[in-house]
Each structure stands twice: as C-alpha cells, then as structure tokens.
C-alpha cells in the first residue's frame, strides 16, 4: 500500500451509529421580508444526502469497499428517502424503523453557497432503542474487517462499551468518531478520531504541539487504545500510536469551502484503509488526503477512489494523444477537481497560425481543452481524395505538442456527435459562421447544462490557401 491505494474491494466494513438525513434547500435571496428582518429565499432546488453514520457508510462504499450500516430511523417520509439514497449508493442497510419517532433530519437553507439557517428535526432515543440493534450487530460482525462507531450524540450509541466488547470478542478492530466531554465509555476501542475541539474538551487546552502529544498519549493509555488520531483543521492531523513516534501531517486542503462531514470522511477512509490491510500511518495518510478533498465541496459529500488517486499522484492526468476510453477517465479526474472542460474538433490537416490562435482562444474559456480530430478516411470523405496532406498520426502529434491543448483524440465518423455526447463538455467551441443548431453534438451539450461558443477564424489563414500556394510554386 505504500506505493498507491489499497484494494478496497477486499474490505468488509460495518458502520453503526446515528443515521441522519441531510436536506438542502437551495435558493436566491434579494430582499428582506416585510414581516421580520430576515431574508426572503426563493427556493430553486432541493437535495437530500445521507448524513451522520449514513455519510460514513456512503464514503466507505464510494471507495469500493463492502459496507453494512446499522442505525435507528423513524417510520416517516425522511426514513423512506434515506433508505432509497443509501441503497442507490451501494450501502447494505439494517435500519431499525421506530414508530412515533422522527428520523434525524437536518435541513439547511443555502443561498449563494452560504448557509442561512439550519433546522433540526429529532426525537430522543432511549437505551431500549439502541438495544434493539444488538442482535443485528452481533450477526453483522461476522466476517467484517473493521467496525466504525459514528457517534453524533443522538442516542443510538448510548452503550458503546457493549459494542466494543462484542467486537473484541471476535477480534474485529473498533474505530470510533467520538462525541461529548467523556471518552471513558470508549475504553478498549482500537482507535478514536476526535477533532481538536472535542479533544481539548476532554483533556484541557493544548497551547502547543508538545502539550497536545503529552496529553494525547496520556489519554490513549487511559482508554487502552492502540492509537489516537486528532484532526486539527488547518493544522492537519496528529497520530499517536502505541510503540511509535508521533506523526504530524500538514493539511492537504487547497481551499476550505465547507467542513460539513469532514470527520465522517476521515474515519471512513481510515476504516476502509485499515480493513484493506493498511497500517495506522498509511491509513492516516489517506484519510488526510481525503479530508483535504472533501472540505472543498459543498455540504455532506463523499470522496471517490479516483479523487484519492489523483490527490496522491497529481501528475496522473497526463496530457497528449489519448484513446476515447482514456479520455473519459481523464475527464472524470479533472472534473473531480472542479475543472471546466472545453472541446472543439476539426481536420487540422496543415497546422497554421489561424489554428494555433483559435485553439489558444478556446483554451482560455476553461481549464482543459480537448481537440477531436477526423481520421484519414473521414477527412477524405469530407475534403476529397487528395486529402489529408498529413496523416492522422502526424496531425495528432503536432496538435499534442501545443501548449494550449490538453488531450487529442481521433474519431472516424463524419461528425464528432457521438464522441461529444459521451464527453458532454462544459463548453463546446466551433470556429466560423455556424449557428448553434448546425453544430454537431450541440443539443446534447446544451441539454446537459453546457454552453456553445462560436469563435471567428483568423482571416487569410486556411489549409486550402496553403495547398494552393504550394501547387503554384
């Protein structure tokens, strides 16, 4: 695992904890209510996502691991929405539906990427509710590589000691994302992952790294943990492992957009990596990378294997000549980083300044430029039997050498419509006096929310003119 990602498909993970439905209402606001000094939000969209232990399970599944989720929900509309969302994400659910109990729900109203208000819908769980999960928990433990306890303090995990004891009996590591000011009921777990605020609530202020390490090691020993991972926001993470020196990792976040669910991502990646055979240090390195990715997303979100791979090896998105299938993979990686994909096409038989300027202008419209190129047979059908002058291999090589071109891909049809419909670029560019309706693939791009931009060709530059000059001379 030291040279890349582990084989997550071999991991068998059990998640138990507070299952939450995260709801987002997106809208616009431009005025204050006449009824009270509050903004009026015109709702334009609604979105549901699994939260809490549900988000942990979704994160594990997104990496390709097998995951089972145990938790308590109500018998309401929110419960049905949660079951559907989790099943769609590949999570095997063993959720106990409780009558007359509201499914834990957090409703956030968002405008211009800013959270205006959060509304919580919840009822108190009693110990008997949590005990109802014990038979399913004992059964689900069999064959699992790790167990993750996701504690949001909502009542599902009122007696974590029983869960820890059952896990230890069968030799399954227990990972816990803790909650509250008393960590004593997590005694005997394998590792816990408090954030800095939670950690200091238990041990007191840590003004420097030395005090954090000393107090952390004391806590690790008191709780009989094999390891303690403290997440420290912009200061990264600190891993304290029995028999090893402290490991301090700087943050990998490029831009912090939303910290919602970051702790879920940390423990899910940590758990999946340990389940796949990684060491505590290796798993922490991956969890740190994943946290850096997820805080750059809005709301409760997950991190995919491709995103992790790209974060570990940022040069993995190579430029140049590519096949269609490779191109689609590269595009997915680029989009996971929020990059805008621009696409154009043509024969590019004899590359001239008009082509170069056109491609440079197209590249300025986004972050990545794809150039789709007609193969030799296609050019001959379009331009005549004496074309192309340069073979497909020659044309691809010259285009790929341009600084503004990221990927060059050939196609064999008369138009690139099929290829464009697979790529679905954010911006489709064409040169000349076309109308959008005349451009191959334009309808599919627009239907997907993309744009069509028509650029003007440079006067006095054309392949036909160059060929005529050569013939005359």
Curated annotation (Swiss-Prot):
Top-level taxon of the source organism: Bacteria
InterPro entries in the record: Bifunc_HldE (IPR023030), Carboh/pur_kinase_PfkB_CS (IPR002173), Cyt_trans-like (IPR004821), PfkB_dom (IPR011611), RfaE_dom_I (IPR011913), RfaE_dom_II (IPR011914), Ribokinase-like (IPR029056), Rossmann-like_a/b/a_fold (IPR014729)
Swiss-Prot/TrEMBL GO biological process terms: ADP-L-glycero-beta-D-manno-heptose biosynthetic process
NCBIfam families in UniProt: cyt_tran_rel, PRK11316.1, rfaE_dom_I, rfaE_dom_II
Subunit organization: Homodimer.
The protein's name in its UniProt record: Bifunctional protein HldE
Single GO MF descriptor: phosphotransferase activity, alcohol group as acceptor
């Amino acid at each position: 695992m030291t040279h890349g990602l582990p084989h997550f498909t071999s991991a068998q993970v059990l998640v138990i904890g507070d299952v939450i439905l995260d709801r987002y209402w997106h809208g616009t606001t431009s005025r204050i209510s006449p009824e009270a000094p509050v903004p009026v939000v015109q709702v334009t969209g609604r979105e549901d996502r699994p939260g809490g232990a549900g988000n942990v399970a979704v994160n594990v599944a997104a990496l390709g691991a097998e995951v089972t989720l145990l938790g308590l929900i109500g018998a309401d509309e929110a419960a049905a929405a949660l079951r559907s969302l989790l099943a769609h994400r590949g999570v095997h659910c063993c959720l106990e539906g409780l009558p007359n109990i509201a499914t834990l729900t957090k409703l956030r109203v968002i405008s211009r990427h800013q959270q205006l208000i959060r509304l919580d819908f919840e009822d108190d769980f009693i110990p008997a509710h949590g005990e109802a999960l014990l038979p399913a928990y004992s059964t689900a433990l069999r064959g699992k590589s790790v167990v993750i306890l996701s504690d949001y303090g909502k009542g599902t995990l009122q007696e974590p000691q029983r869960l820890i004891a059952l896990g230890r009996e069968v030799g399954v590591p227990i990972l816990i994302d803790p909650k509250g000011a008393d960590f004593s009921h997590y005694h005997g777990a394998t590792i816990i992952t408090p954030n800095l605020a939670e950690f200091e609530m238990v041990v007191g202020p840590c003004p420097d790294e030395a005090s954090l390490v000393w107090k952390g090691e004391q806590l690790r020993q008191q709780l009989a943990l094999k390891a303690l991972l403290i997440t420290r926001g912009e200061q990264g993470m600190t891993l304290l492992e029995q028999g090893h020196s402290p490991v301090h990792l700087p943050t990998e976040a490029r831009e912090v957009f939303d910290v919602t669910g970051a702790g879920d991502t940390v423990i899910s990646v940590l758990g999946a990596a340990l389940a796949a055979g990684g060491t505590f240090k290796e798993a922490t390195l991956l969890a740190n990378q994943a946290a850096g990715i997820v805080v750059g997303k809005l709301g409760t979100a997950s991190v995919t294997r491709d995103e992790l791979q790209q974060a570990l090896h940022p040069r993995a998105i190579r430029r140049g000549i590519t096949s269609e299938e490779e191109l689609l993979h590269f595009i997915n990686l680029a989009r996971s980083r929020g990059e805008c994909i621009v696409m154009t096409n043509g024969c590019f038989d004899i590359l001239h300044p008009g082509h170069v300027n056109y491609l440079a202008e197209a590249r300025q419209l986004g972050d990545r430029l794809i150039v789709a190129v007609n193969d030799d047979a296609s050019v001959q059908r379009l331009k005549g039997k004496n074309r192309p002058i340069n073979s497909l291999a020659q044309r691809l090589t010259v285009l790929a050498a341009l600084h503004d071109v990221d990927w060059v891909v050939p196609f064999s049809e008369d138009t690139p419509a099929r290829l464009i419909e697979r790529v679905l670029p954010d911006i489709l560019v064409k040169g000349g006096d076309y109308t959008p309706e005349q451009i191959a693939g334009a309808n599919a791009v627009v239907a997907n929310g993309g744009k069509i931009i028509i650029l003007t060709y440079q006067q006095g530059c054309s392949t036909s003119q160059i060929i005529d000059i050569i013939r005359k001379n």
